[in-house]
Amino acid sequence: MGKYFGTDGVRGEANLELTPELAFKLGRFGGYVLSQHETEAPKVFVGRDTRISGEMLESALVAGLLSVGIHVYKLGVLATPAVAYLVETEGASAGVMIXASHNPALDNGIKFFGGDGFKLDDEKEAEIEALLDAEEDTLPXPSAEGLGILVDYPEGLRKYEGYLVSTGTPLDGMKVALDTANGAASTSARQIFADLGAQLTVIGETPDGLNINLNVGSTHPEALQEVVKESGSAIGLAFDGDSDRLIAVDENGDIVDGDKIMYIIGKYLSEKGQLAQNTIVTTVMSNLGFHKALNREGINKAVTAVGDRYVVEEMRKSGYNLGGEQSGHVILMDYNTTGDGQLSAVQLTKIMKETGKSLSELAAEVTIYPQKLVNIRVENVMKEKAMEVPAIKAIIEKMEEEMAGNGRILVRPSGTEPLLRVMAEAPTTEEVDYYVDTITDVVRAEIGID
């Protein structure tokens, strides 16, 4: 990743790290890079989530885009995947989303989509970063007739809602509980599921700029679990702040995570002959129980590094149409170019309706193994070399031998911090504790700085 761009755009604490000045430059330089080969006046869609800093950053970003002659279509508050969908289907030059996913309200981010609806590749990000770091801004500064035009485009949200409804099936009064995380889905999820005919209970639908993801949403599903049980709902659907993730809750109040959601959708598509190459793309963090369930069904898997960016890269490279992460990013490439929590939710309820099975029945086919993750502080220079340390290598091999195939160990460096992550999965919590504690003791003794 670069100096400004991380794995999911530019992020930081709003007004301190991600300032209006930086947002203006990102609009100006990013817009220029993404539209310099356009033969007609370029058009860029801009959306945001509900953070209090969103309008401030949007104003600065839009000014930057307009300053290089780009026509800006302001979408207002809507889901990140809605921007990707609209860019691809309406022939825009690019899209920009101002959001910070599941992060707290003080953070914000700016994420670009190319004209194909996909997140920017490393080369385009490097071009933008080079302009940001240049000593002088040498980009054109057009006079009045060359400036961009600003257009409010609320109908973009309605088009996205209509599209998601078109991919579903009538729910005929199914009781559905929604948690929109006081975020981007608060403008659309209720409408989508009402149009599908669901009987709704909704929480996390009163954003005030500061309460996005605050004890609600996909990272805090506890409130939704209670609401599902109290309302007698058949399913609960929790989105994150920008609605690119989904965590579900079954009728008993139990969590159905991204691994289980991918399995349910993957099995459904496989049985219909619609799962490309009969393969699901997942990351190294997916649970062993998920892998065992896929093996039992004869479904193949491709495994990538952690991050939906890497999942999408593998899907595009190899022609797969389903992938995702345990955290709830699910990419359905036949429908959209990026993870889409509300799309995943529509597909999940469709599968329940078509199969006549409850969510707990569908999810029961995946037995999630207990998992434990411990972070150990190490010198940055050592985190990449940990697996070369003889004692560490030996203890991992010893633990894997003891597991005899009925468990999994993953030791990997953090991509952003001076940490070595030690993760284990096994049939019981006692076994998991034993494996992780044994390995971490050796790692700390050899290279730890705690």
UniProtKB/Swiss-Prot annotation:
Pfam families: PGM_PMM_I, PGM_PMM_II, PGM_PMM_III, PGM_PMM_IV. Its EC number is 5.4.2.10. Activated by phosphorylation. Its cofactor is Mg(2+). CDD domains: GlmM (cd05802). GO terms for biological process: carbohydrate metabolic process; peptidoglycan biosynthetic process; UDP-N-acetylglucosamine biosynthetic process. It comes from the Bacteria. Keywords: Isomerase, Magnesium, Metal-binding, Phosphoprotein. It catalyses: alpha-D-glucosamine 1-phosphate = D-glucosamine 6-phosphate. Binds 1 Mg(2+) ion per subunit. The modification Phosphoserine is found at S101. Mg(2+) binds at S101, D240, D242, D244. NCBIfam families: glmM (TIGR01455). Belongs to the phosphohexose mutase family. This is Phosphoglucosamine mutase. The gene is glmM.
